[in-house]
Curated annotation (Swiss-Prot):
Ribonucleoprotein found in the keyword field: yes
Gene designation per UniProt: rps18
Pfam families tied to this protein: Ribosomal_S18
Name of this chain's protein: Small ribosomal subunit protein bS18c
Source organism of the structure: Drimys granadensis
Gene3D superfamilies in the cross-refs: Ribosomal protein S18
Record-linked InterPro entries: Ribosomal_bS18, Ribosomal_bS18_CS, Ribosomal_bS18_sf
Amino acid sequence: MDKSKRPFRKSKRSFRRRLPPIGSGDRIDYRNMSLISRFISEQGKILSRRVNRLTLKQQRLITIAIKQARILSSLPFLNNEKQFERTESTPRTAGPKTRNK
């Protein structure tokens, strides 16, 4: 049989469908911190819908719940520990500057 006339065959590989990240019994609410924290990055940013594998409606509800939790200070706006680390200061060589008149 000629290559151009040969029918196209797709290899049939078995695949395991991933479980949805949110079950039917899970309530998307700002008080449900164990659920909300799964959809936040290490830096405290809301992960995208593609990364979360959520539907559009679920992503919207998660986003609203995260924002409510941030406003009520259940969640930090930023999760940056390095911001508060104190660096060793260098001593000043010159004394206080004086203005000449």
